[in-house]
Regions:
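Structured mid-to-C-terminal alpha-helical surface segments
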Residues: 1-47, 58-65, 70, 74-281
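Glycine-rich beta-strand-to-loop/alpha-helix junction loops that act as flexible
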Residues: 49-54
Length: 281
């Protein structure tokens, strides 16, 4: 394992908007991990990235909110255990040995979905070098069930400065609209206010503008894949329940970039008007 130094973290602080050194250090670990994963020839032909880290660090850069994990999807045809071993091999030099590596079955979307997804969940625990404090946790999650994406996977350049060099890769990433479709799915799967923020931010800030109809198309693709059924009214009602949940509305308080003012109630109204109202009845 090649450990970070405090000097590395302080240098990275000039390139990211996070106020806490712990966040800066974790961001640097994520950057190194992303490049390590996609610079590996085997994994580059097997995995793609989606989720909040890709959305904010790549599609909507500079990032508006902090993200702390890496979400992957396996699109290649190699056995799932080969994928697990390759991820652990590649990340050993960046993150060391995982503290947890397990397989799980998860219902990814609606509560009445009938087809769960198989997920690989790997957790790394590292002592921070920037400041004394509790350990940092880096989580890598890989979905090995959803191997056929709705839209073509994109090869996207990604780079960051490290120790006087530019560390570069070309990562496989989900199309913005498909990723927002999975974000809409996540909004109804879990009580995390960041999913609402991500949809609102992408709909209002993406350049070129995101197409709400394309987002809905991808969302419905995954609903059908999982055997889920629900109408527009059910989604609207569930969003209203979310917006009455104090924890859901407070989720973004420690994650936003300085200077961003965010009102989850306003975001909820916008997402309902511009996205949910496009759902079939």
């Amino acid at each position: 394992m090649t450990p970070l130094t405090r000097r590395d973290v302080l240098a990275h602080q000039a390139h990211v908007p996070w106020p806490k050194l712990r966040q800066v250090e974790q961001d640097l670990l994520l950057c190194r991990s992303m490049c390590a994963l996609f610079n590996d020839k085997f994994l580059h032909g097997q995995i793609a990235m989606r989720g909040g880290t890709l959305l904010h660090k790549v599609h909507l850069a500079p990032p508006a909110r902090y993200s702390e994990d890496i979400d992957l999807v396996v699109f290649g045809n190699r056995p799932e255990e080969h994928i697990r071993l390759a991820i652990e091999r590649v990340l050993a030099d960046v993150l060391g040995r995982p503290t947890q590596s397990l397989w799980d079955w998860v219902l990814m979307a609606l509560r009445n979905a009938s087809k769960p997804s198989r997920l690989l969940r790997i957790t790394y625990t590292l002592q921070p070098v920037s400041l004394p404090g509790p350990p940092l946790n880096i989580k890598i999650e890989a979905n090995v069930t959803e191997r056929t994406p709705h839209r073509a996977i994109q090869e996207i350049p990604f780079a960051f400065p490290f120790q006087g060099k530019s560390i570069e890769t070309r990562l496989n990433g989900y199309d913005l609209h498909e990723m927002l479709g999975t974000k809409l799915r996540a909004l109804f799967q879990r009580e995390a206010g960041r999913d609402l923020f991500d949809l609102f931010w992408a709909l209002t800030k993406s350049s070129p503008p995101a197409d709400p109809a394309a987002i809905i198309e991808s969302f419905l693709f995954y609903v059908r894949q999982e055997g889920g059924v629900a109408g527009r009214a059910e989604f609207v009602d569930l969003l209203q329940v979310r917006l009455k949940n104090r924890g859901f509305c407070a989720d973004m308080e420690q994650l936003l970039r300085a200077g961003i003012v965010y009102d989850p109630q306003e975001a909820g109204r916008y997402v309902q008007a511009h996205l949910l109202n496009l759902l079939p009845r």
